[in-house]
A protein has these predicted regions:
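Extracytoplasmic cell-surface/polysaccharide-interacting catalytic and binding patches
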Residues: 1-51, 117, 125-133
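Extended, low-complexity, intrinsically disordered C-terminal regulatory tails
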Residues: 40-72
């Protein structure tokens, strides 16, 4: 089972989860205070950040189930567990981000390429999953 930590955006928002990521970056865009984040998702994102040497923009991290439904997310989305993030890096193609993410999660984790929307979905699930959105 993937470890997931719970935080409060109000109390813990500025808390560093790694060198370059804080709790508030993973918060649901609906304003909910609760934030759930899997440490191994943070590890993957930090590795991506370090590899490309550029800021990783988290477009969507944790989502409450109602917010996930509102934005058209699938039932049981990894976002609703705190194990997923949709990311983009200015000046780096989604194909390059996805290829690197796949290389550091050879036997686990999900990587979805959303070329038209300009982001990559990365998640810390226990099994391997790859797709193009």
């Amino acid at each position: 089972m993937v470890e997931i930590n719970a935080y409060s955006k109000k109390k813990d928002g500025a808390k560093k989860l790694s060198t370059n990521f804080t709790v508030k970056e993973f918060a649901c865009n609906d304003g909910t205070d609760a934030v759930f984040v899997a440490p191994r998702l943070v590890m993957v994102l930090q590795s991506i950040r370090s590899h490309f040497g550029k800021a990783v923009n988290i477009n969507s991290g944790y989502r409450t189930p109602p917010y996930n439904a509102q934005v058209g997310g699938v039932d049981g989305s990894q976002h609703t567990y705190g194990t997923a993030a949709d990311i983009s890096i200015k000046g780096v193609s989604v194909a390059d981000v996805a290829a690197y993410a796949r290389s550091i999660m050879p036997d686990w984790g999900g990587v979805g390429i959303y070329k038209e929307q300009g982001f990559v979905h990365v998640d810390a699930r226990e099994t391997r999953a790859d797709w193009n959105g």
